[in-house]
Amino acid sequence: MSFVVIIPARFASTRLPGKPLLDINGKPMIVHVLERARESGAERIIVATDHEDVARAVEAAGGEVCMTRADHQSGTERLAEVVEKCGFSDDTVIVNVQGDEPMIPAVIIRQVAENLAQRQVGMATLAAPVHSAEEAFNPNVVKVVLDSEGYALYFSRATIPWDRDRFAKGLETVGDNFLRHLGIYGYRAGFIRRYVNWQPSPLEHIEMLEQLRVLWYGEKIHVAVAEQVPGTGVDTAEDLERVRAEMR
């Protein structure tokens, strides 16, 4: 099947300035992400950035760049600019791979594209089982609950679903009822065009989760369990050191 990968790579980062260019074992982080995307079999891979230094690093590695505005409020807005500049047809399958995921398995990039292509829905994503209480109660780990057909009912930083009987006995263990959301998305290009014209939703602002806008407006998001759980993403200096060690 045919799909396009777009990798948003914003240069400014509060915790890690210049994050896309941080060195991981001799290569800029963004180049590692580009290489994972190439392994997925995508027809076309585009790095969307607002910074010339990132563009030069990607082009030096043989990658394609689309320069975007610096004032986007979200990664999806940056994707929308690329979709318009490239003139993708509404039915083009687009996979959004985060620029700070140098250890993302190529197999799940393709998985989310295939899941979307097989369904009459505008958006798809992935999740992974939660096995520890630490994850279940961590607000930085986004949980998702699904309906009987694998469509998202809700995403939350809260512990959902709340296991009333188990948690009444203590919060040390969790059962098999929890899924954590993975930050990889597949979209049809036409859906991206519609999405950016919707006003942000109240729930989106409360949880600070952009995908809640989709549910607020009555659209469906298909969620599959990832065939392979991705490694550490890079949000902090500690994450960076961990990734460097794991990728040696």
Swiss-Prot record:
GO terms for cellular component: cytosol. It is an enzyme of class 2 (transferase). The keyword Transcription regulation does not apply. It comes from the Bacteria. GO terms for biological process: CMP-keto-3-deoxy-D-manno-octulosonic acid biosynthetic process; lipopolysaccharide biosynthetic process. InterPro entries: Cytidylyl_trans, KdsB, Nucleotide-diphossugar_trans. It is found in: Cytoplasm. It catalyses: 3-deoxy-alpha-D-manno-oct-2-ulosonate + CTP = CMP-3-deoxy-beta-D-manno-octulosonate + diphosphate. Its EC number is 2.7.7.38. Pathway: Nucleotide-sugar biosynthesis; CMP-3-deoxy-D-manno-octulosonate biosynthesis; CMP-3-deoxy-D-manno-octulosonate from 3-deoxy-D-manno-octulosonate and CTP: step 1/1; Bacterial outer membrane biogenesis; lipopolysaccharide biosynthesis. One of its GO terms (molecular function) is 3-deoxy-manno-octulosonate cytidylyltransferase activity. Gene3D superfamilies: Spore Coat Polysaccharide Biosynthesis Protein SpsA, Chain A (3.90.550.10). Keywords: Cytoplasm, Lipopolysaccharide biosynthesis, Nucleotidyltransferase, Transferase. Activates KDO (a required 8-carbon sugar) for incorporation into bacterial lipopolysaccharide in Gram-negative bacteria. HAMAP family: KdsB. This is 3-deoxy-manno-octulosonate cytidylyltransferase.
